[in-house]
């Protein structure tokens, strides 16, 4: 498996990078992620579980039996990749696509 294929196994599923992008702003509660992203709750639960298992994010216990999610160092390492993808999506990358 190539390095890119290995990375896509972790963050290539729909919504995964959008969850990571949202968490770059800091820890978020489940309900806030769901509302801000508009992702179906069952899909969000699955993506959070997958990203946690891969060491990209962690759950933080809060009061009243609620949790927040925050990026680990491994998740924070995706910042440059996410910013580059955003620039590419805007067409700001020089050269031909």
Where do the protein language model's features map onto the residues?
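Short beta-strand "wing" residues that participate in macromolecule-binding interfaces
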Residues: 59
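C-terminal regulatory/oligomerization modules of transcriptional regulators
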Residues: 80-97
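Residues within the DNA-recognition helix of helix-turn-helix
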Residues: 47
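Glycine-centered, phosphate/nucleic-acid-interacting loop/turn motifs that mediate DNA/RNA or nucleotide
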Residues: 55
């Amino acid at each position: 498996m190539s390095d890119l294929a290995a990375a896509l196994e972790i963050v290539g599923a729909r919504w995964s990078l959008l969850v990571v992008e949202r968490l770059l702003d800091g820890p978020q509660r489940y309900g806030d992620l769901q509302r801000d992203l508009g992702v179906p709750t069952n899909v969000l639960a699955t993506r959070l579980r997958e990203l946690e298992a891969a060491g990209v994010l962690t759950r933080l216990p809060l009061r009243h039996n609620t949790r927040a999610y925050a990026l680990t160092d491994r998740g924070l390492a995706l910042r440059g990749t996410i910013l580059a993808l955003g620039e590419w999506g805007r067409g700001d990358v020089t050269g031909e696509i």
